[in-house]
């Protein structure tokens, strides 16, 4: 959590030449403060694993949600992309009212539900990677939506079930970690991958065309210099599509 906060503050002060240093100093200070408050207790290893897992949930679930309309809009039409986003959101909205039925009538434990959701979401994502028609997209993204429906709330339920003594504190920390991960790793991470792989593919296929449409500044993941990759200029691509 402190690492994510450090990267968050580094992004706030990115205009400064010492943005990373400022971020790490703030993150280190927060870590030291937490260590003093908790009397340097290591805490539960399982709780730490759940926090790390929820960071991945936030990045994958909310990060994908932020990009899904653009991705499907490019595969099909912009209007169809909106319909697919509404379709997946409607499935999740409806199923979350069925959580009580699933747990008490079907007798599925929170851990069992997380496992089932992981399998279903994996199947849905693999199908989504091969979709070529709007009908196939409805099926693939519908399966993915069913899988990801209970990730976030069930992770919070596991915390409350396994660590009741933490009260709302652990749930709040877990939710914060998930949102920070989505904002720092999920959306930006997918954007970085898009820039990196689109640029590399165009450069391999047509170096001259890449030089014409490449972005002025490189993309970086978490502002790390070693991850710098030159993507494509969105404005130039938009003008080319409209031409």
Model-inferred region functions:
Residues 112-127, 135:
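Structural signature of the two symmetry-related core transmembrane helices
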Residues 55, 135-151:
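Hydrophobic core of transmembrane alpha-helices in multi-pass small-molecule transporters
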Residues 64-68, 149-163, 170:
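Intracellular juxtamembrane helix-capping segments at the cytosolic ends
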Residues 2-18, 39-94, 183-196:
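Extracytoplasmic gate region of multi-pass secondary transporters
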Residues 165-198:
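A late C-terminal transmembrane helix in Major Facilitator Superfamily
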Residues 188-243:
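Low-complexity, proline/glycine-enriched hydrophobic segments characteristic of transmembrane helices
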Residues 62, 145-153, 179, 183:
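Small-residue-rich segments within alpha-helical transmembrane domains of MFS-like 12-TM solute carriers
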Residues 95-110:
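Helix-to-loop junctions at the C-terminal end of transmembrane segments
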């Amino acid at each position: 959590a402190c690492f994510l906060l450090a990267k968050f503050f580094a992004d706030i002060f990115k205009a400064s030449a010492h943005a990373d240093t400022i971020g790490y100093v703030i993150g280190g200070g927060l870590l030291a403060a937490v260590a003093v408050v908790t009397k340097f207790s290591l805490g539960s290893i399982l709780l730490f694993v759940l926090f790390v897992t929820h960071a991945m949930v936030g990045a994958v679930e909310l990060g994908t949600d932020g990009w899904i309309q653009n991705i499907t809009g490019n595969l099909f039409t912009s209007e169809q992309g909106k319909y697919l986003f509404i379709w997946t959101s409607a499935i999740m909205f409806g199923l979350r009212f069925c959580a009580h039925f699933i747990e008490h009538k079907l007798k599925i434990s929170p851990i069992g539900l997380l496992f089932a959701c992981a399998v279903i979401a994996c199947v849905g994502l693999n199908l989504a990677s091969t979709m070529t028609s709007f009908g196939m997209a409805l099926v693939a993204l519908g399966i993915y939506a069913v899988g990801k429906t209970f990730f976030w709330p069930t992770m919070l339920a596991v915390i409350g079930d396994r660590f009741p003594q933490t009260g709302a504190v652990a749930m709040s920390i877990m939710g914060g970690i998930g949102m920070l991960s989505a904002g720092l790793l999920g959306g930006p991470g997918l954007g970085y991958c898009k820039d990196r792989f689109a640029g590399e593919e165009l450069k391999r296929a047509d170096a001259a065309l890449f030089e014409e449409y490449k972005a002025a500044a490189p993309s970086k993941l978490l502002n790390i210099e070693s991850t710098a990759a030159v993507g494509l200029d969105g404005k130039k691509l938009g003008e080319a599509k409209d031409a």
